Amino acid sequence: MIIYLHGFDSTSPGNHEKVLQLQFIDEDVRLISYSTLHPRHDMQHLLKQVDKMIQHSDDDRPLICGVGLGGFWAERVGFLCDIRQVIVNPNLFPQENMGGKIDRPEEYVDIATKCVANFREKNRDRCMVMLSRHDEMLDSQRSAQMLGAYYEIVWDDIQTHKFKSISPHLQRIKAFKTLG
Protein backbone atom coordinates (compact mmCIF):
# COMPACT_ATOMS: atom_id res chain seq x y z
CA MET A 1 0.00 0.00 0.00
CA ILE A 2 1.17 3.49 -0.89
CA ILE A 3 -0.58 6.44 0.71
CA TYR A 4 -0.37 9.60 -1.41
CA LEU A 5 -0.66 13.13 -0.02
CA HIS A 6 -1.22 15.93 -2.52
CA GLY A 7 0.37 19.35 -2.26
CA PHE A 8 -1.36 22.70 -1.82
CA ASP A 9 -2.95 22.44 -5.28
CA SER A 10 -5.20 19.52 -4.44
CA THR A 11 -7.12 19.73 -7.73
CA SER A 12 -4.07 19.51 -9.98
CA PRO A 13 -4.33 16.75 -12.63
CA GLY A 14 -0.72 15.94 -11.71
CA ASN A 15 -1.96 14.22 -8.56
CA HIS A 16 -3.90 11.65 -10.58
CA GLU A 17 -0.88 11.17 -12.86
CA LYS A 18 1.41 10.48 -9.91
CA VAL A 19 -1.08 8.03 -8.40
CA LEU A 20 -1.16 6.16 -11.72
CA GLN A 21 2.64 6.12 -11.85
CA LEU A 22 2.87 4.83 -8.26
CA GLN A 23 0.53 1.97 -9.20
CA PHE A 24 3.44 0.47 -11.15
CA ILE A 25 5.03 -0.14 -7.73
CA ASP A 26 1.91 -1.19 -5.84
CA GLU A 27 -1.63 -1.52 -7.20
CA ASP A 28 -2.98 -0.29 -3.86
CA VAL A 29 -2.37 3.48 -3.97
CA ARG A 30 -4.66 5.55 -1.77
CA LEU A 31 -4.99 9.31 -1.97
CA ILE A 32 -5.92 11.12 1.22
CA SER A 33 -7.42 14.52 0.65
CA TYR A 34 -7.08 17.25 3.26
CA SER A 35 -8.04 20.91 3.40
CA THR A 36 -4.53 22.47 3.15
CA LEU A 37 -6.06 25.53 4.85
CA HIS A 38 -6.19 24.51 8.51
CA PRO A 39 -2.88 22.92 9.62
CA ARG A 40 -3.91 21.66 13.07
CA HIS A 41 -7.08 20.09 11.70
CA ASP A 42 -5.12 18.62 8.78
CA MET A 43 -2.62 17.02 11.16
CA GLN A 44 -5.37 15.31 13.19
CA HIS A 45 -7.24 14.24 10.05
CA LEU A 46 -4.14 12.82 8.36
CA LEU A 47 -2.98 10.92 11.44
CA LYS A 48 -6.41 9.38 11.88
CA GLN A 49 -6.79 8.43 8.20
CA VAL A 50 -3.27 7.01 7.81
CA ASP A 51 -3.59 4.98 11.01
CA LYS A 52 -6.95 3.59 9.83
CA MET A 53 -5.47 2.64 6.44
CA ILE A 54 -2.50 0.90 8.04
CA GLN A 55 -4.76 -1.03 10.44
CA HIS A 56 -6.97 -2.24 7.57
CA SER A 57 -4.16 -3.17 5.19
CA ASP A 58 -2.38 -6.49 4.95
CA ASP A 59 0.76 -4.79 3.57
CA ASP A 60 3.52 -5.15 6.13
CA ARG A 61 5.58 -2.50 4.31
CA PRO A 62 3.30 0.45 3.60
CA LEU A 63 4.74 3.70 2.30
CA ILE A 64 3.55 7.29 2.48
CA CYS A 65 4.43 9.66 -0.36
CA GLY A 66 3.85 13.40 -0.36
CA VAL A 67 4.55 16.19 -2.83
CA GLY A 68 5.15 19.83 -1.84
CA LEU A 69 2.98 20.56 1.20
CA GLY A 70 2.10 16.86 1.19
CA GLY A 71 5.81 16.21 1.76
CA PHE A 72 5.71 18.30 4.94
CA TRP A 73 2.89 16.08 6.19
CA ALA A 74 4.20 12.75 4.86
CA GLU A 75 7.49 13.11 6.74
CA ARG A 76 5.78 13.82 10.07
CA VAL A 77 2.77 11.52 9.77
CA GLY A 78 4.92 8.70 8.39
CA PHE A 79 7.27 9.05 11.35
CA LEU A 80 4.43 9.10 13.88
CA CYS A 81 2.76 6.08 12.23
CA ASP A 82 6.09 4.24 11.85
CA ILE A 83 6.04 3.83 8.08
CA ARG A 84 8.62 4.78 5.46
CA GLN A 85 8.23 8.06 3.63
CA VAL A 86 9.06 9.45 0.19
CA ILE A 87 8.85 13.23 0.07
CA VAL A 88 9.02 15.06 -3.24
CA ASN A 89 10.04 18.74 -3.28
CA PRO A 90 8.77 19.02 0.30
CA ASN A 91 7.57 22.39 1.52
CA LEU A 92 9.57 22.47 4.75
CA PHE A 93 8.71 26.08 5.57
CA PRO A 94 5.01 26.58 4.79
CA GLN A 95 4.82 29.30 7.42
CA GLU A 96 7.16 31.36 5.21
CA ASN A 97 5.56 30.80 1.82
CA MET A 98 1.89 30.04 2.48
CA GLY A 99 0.90 33.40 3.94
CA GLY A 100 -2.22 34.68 2.21
CA LYS A 101 -3.05 31.17 0.99
CA ILE A 102 -4.02 29.59 4.30
CA ASP A 103 -5.75 30.88 7.41
CA ARG A 104 -3.07 30.31 10.04
CA PRO A 105 0.40 29.68 8.59
CA GLU A 106 1.90 30.15 12.06
CA GLU A 107 0.34 26.81 13.04
CA TYR A 108 2.99 25.08 10.93
CA VAL A 109 5.68 26.47 13.25
CA ASP A 110 3.74 25.14 16.22
CA ILE A 111 3.36 21.71 14.60
CA ALA A 112 7.03 21.59 13.57
CA THR A 113 8.24 22.45 17.06
CA LYS A 114 5.80 20.16 18.85
CA CYS A 115 6.65 17.06 16.87
CA VAL A 116 8.91 14.62 18.74
CA ALA A 117 12.21 16.26 19.69
CA ASN A 118 14.93 15.41 17.17
CA PHE A 119 12.42 13.41 15.15
CA ARG A 120 14.63 13.46 12.05
CA GLU A 121 17.44 11.78 13.96
CA LYS A 122 14.97 9.14 15.15
CA ASN A 123 13.61 8.84 11.60
CA ARG A 124 17.08 8.54 10.03
CA ASP A 125 17.13 6.53 6.78
CA ARG A 126 13.34 5.95 6.86
CA CYS A 127 12.62 8.79 4.46
CA MET A 128 13.76 9.31 0.88
CA VAL A 129 13.81 12.87 -0.45
CA MET A 130 13.39 13.69 -4.13
CA LEU A 131 14.38 17.22 -5.08
CA SER A 132 14.17 19.04 -8.37
CA ARG A 133 17.13 21.18 -9.37
CA HIS A 134 14.58 23.36 -11.22
CA ASP A 135 12.05 23.92 -8.43
CA GLU A 136 10.62 27.35 -9.22
CA MET A 137 8.67 27.54 -5.93
CA LEU A 138 11.06 26.34 -3.21
CA ASP A 139 14.78 26.49 -2.46
CA SER A 140 15.82 22.88 -3.03
CA GLN A 141 19.37 23.57 -1.81
CA ARG A 142 17.96 24.72 1.52
CA SER A 143 15.88 21.54 1.73
CA ALA A 144 18.92 19.41 0.91
CA GLN A 145 20.97 21.13 3.62
CA MET A 146 18.23 20.57 6.18
CA LEU A 147 17.50 16.93 5.29
CA GLY A 148 20.73 15.55 3.82
CA ALA A 149 22.25 14.59 7.16
CA TYR A 150 19.32 12.27 7.87
CA TYR A 151 17.92 11.03 4.57
CA GLU A 152 18.99 9.98 1.10
CA ILE A 153 18.59 12.86 -1.36
CA VAL A 154 17.69 11.98 -4.95
CA TRP A 155 18.23 14.87 -7.37
CA ASP A 156 16.21 15.28 -10.55
CA ASP A 157 17.56 17.46 -13.36
CA ILE A 158 14.34 17.70 -15.40
CA GLN A 159 11.26 18.16 -13.21
CA THR A 160 9.91 21.43 -11.79
CA HIS A 161 8.16 21.93 -8.44
CA LYS A 162 5.07 19.83 -9.22
CA PHE A 163 7.31 16.94 -10.32
CA LYS A 164 4.91 15.77 -13.01
CA SER A 165 6.81 12.57 -13.81
CA ILE A 166 8.20 10.34 -11.09
CA SER A 167 8.55 7.46 -13.56
CA PRO A 168 12.37 7.62 -13.79
CA HIS A 169 12.50 7.11 -10.02
CA LEU A 170 9.95 4.30 -9.63
CA GLN A 171 12.51 1.50 -9.28
CA ARG A 172 14.34 3.41 -6.57
CA ILE A 173 11.06 4.10 -4.73
CA LYS A 174 10.08 0.42 -5.04
CA ALA A 175 13.42 -0.71 -3.61
CA PHE A 176 13.05 1.78 -0.74
CA LYS A 177 9.52 0.51 -0.01
CA THR A 178 10.64 -3.13 0.14
CA LEU A 179 13.13 -2.28 2.89
CA GLY A 180 10.13 -1.87 5.19
Swiss-Prot record:
Gene3D superfamilies: alpha/beta hydrolase (3.40.50.1820). InterPro entries: AB_hydrolase_fold (IPR029058), UPF0227 (IPR022987), UPF0227/Esterase_YqiA (IPR008886). It comes from the Bacteria. Belongs to the UPF0227 family. NCBIfam families: PRK04940.1. HAMAP family: UPF0227 (MF_01047). This is UPF0227 protein PC1_2487. It comes from Pectobacterium carotovorum subsp. carotovorum (strain PC1). The lineage of its organism: Bacteria, Pseudomonadati, Pseudomonadota, Gammaproteobacteria, Enterobacterales.
